[in-house]
Structure formats: structure tokens, C-alpha cells
């Protein structure tokens, strides 16, 4: 393992997406400026999935060297909205500064909902002013609410409620982790917001409960669903590591939707890791 090997893997479109993703998360765990710079190689790729994950990782690492790159990605009107959304979310993890706040305010009015909703959430998180790493090891786009299951479920499912409060309810239910919480989250997959449903799918991947599999399969298989939702459903299924999940994933290994097909390849690789005897997923071999 080393940074240079990982950088070369990430920057080469002929390397499998599964291998590039392993390299990316290897770099995520090496908190050095060189790692952050290596990750930026991904933004020259044709892969929307890789660029999206690179933006996510840079937001988790919070290296100051990444801010300019993330601002550039967010502002690039030629970039895919899935990548731009993730850049906006990543910026919400940094300490507030004028250039970040100004950019988020600007793009919170963007006509593309995944971008505008993400930037609104990032602004609300910066306003909250707390820097909390969840028990799942992630910096999330909202802080979990305080309250009861009943209150969280009501807020989560209320489409007229403030989006940030709904996210807070979502993360409360994730941390609660009960069967009732899982089914409340599953019910929320009927929402109109692709961004919201994609985050619920991500949360299911963190929880790794078999009870969420039917909701994830339904989201992945819906050809009318936004690619950001279908891809996140696929990756969550891979993280759960269940045979039923693998069977569902296998149907989409050659799907024409690029981000879904690549996510399925990554998910199958993660499933292999979760159910096999490999010691380390994050490698740059």
C-alpha cells in the first residue's frame, strides 16, 4: 500500500471501479495533504460514481487543501449534479468561512433540486456549529435530533416539514436502530426528494439490517428513480452482505445506467469482502 499506487489507480479509467474505490478509501484513511491531492485525480475521470465518492471522502477528511477543489466542483455547470451535490455536502463539514458560505448560499437557489437541497442542508449544518462524528464513523449532513421515536417518525414522514429537521429525524432513527425505526425509514423511501431517498439508502447501508433489503431492492429496481437513489441502494445492499442482496445486485452488473452498473460492481466487491476472509478492504495493491 502507498499513496502513489492509489493515486495511479484512481486516475486511470481502465482500472476497475471496484479497485479504484478500494484505493480511494485507502487514501481516506491516510490523513495527509498528499492523500487529499491524490484523491483529486478522480475529478478528471469519466466516472460519476468515482467523482461523487471522491467528493464525499474529501468532506470526511476535512483537509484544508480540498476546499478550493470542492468549490470548483460545486460551481461547475458542466459537471453531473450527483457530483456537485456531494461537493456541496462536503463543504458543510468544514469550519464556516466566507467563501464556503457564499457558495452554499448561491447554490441553495440552484434550479436542480439535488444541488439546492444539499446546499441548504450544508448551510443549516454550519449554522448549528457542531462537529460530531457519528457512531458509524461518518460526518453527516445533519445532527441527530433529540426526542422520541414517535416524534422522529412524524417529522421524517412529513413532506411539509423543514428538510433539515427531517434529516435530523432520519439520523435519530438510524442511531436508534430498532425494527420500528427501520420500517419508518423504509416508509420514507416513498418521498418525492431524490436527495432525501438517497440519504435514507446510505443510512440503511450503515445500519446493515436485513429488514431494509426489500426497500433497497425496490429503490434499485425502479427505472424511473433518480440514479443517485438507485446507486445508493445498490451500495447499501453490498454493505449488508446478504445472499438475497447479492442475487438482486447480480441482475444489474451490465445495466446501461453507468452509475448503477458501477455501484453494483462495487457492491458485489464489498459483499465479497464482507462475507470472505480478507483482512483489509482499503488497500491500494
From Swiss-Prot:
This is Deoxyhypusine hydroxylase. It is found in: Cytoplasm; Nucleus. Its cofactor is Fe(2+). Keywords: Cytoplasm, Hypusine biosynthesis, Iron, Metal-binding, Monooxygenase, Nucleus, Oxidoreductase, Repeat. Fe cation 2 binds at residues 198-199, 231-232. It catalyses: [eIF5A protein]-deoxyhypusine + AH2 + O2 = [eIF5A protein]-hypusine + A + H2O. Belongs to the deoxyhypusine hydroxylase family. Pathway: Protein modification; eIF5A hypusination. GO terms for molecular function: deoxyhypusine monooxygenase activity; metal ion binding. HEAT-like PBS-type repeats lie at residues 50-76, 83-110, 165-191, 229-255.
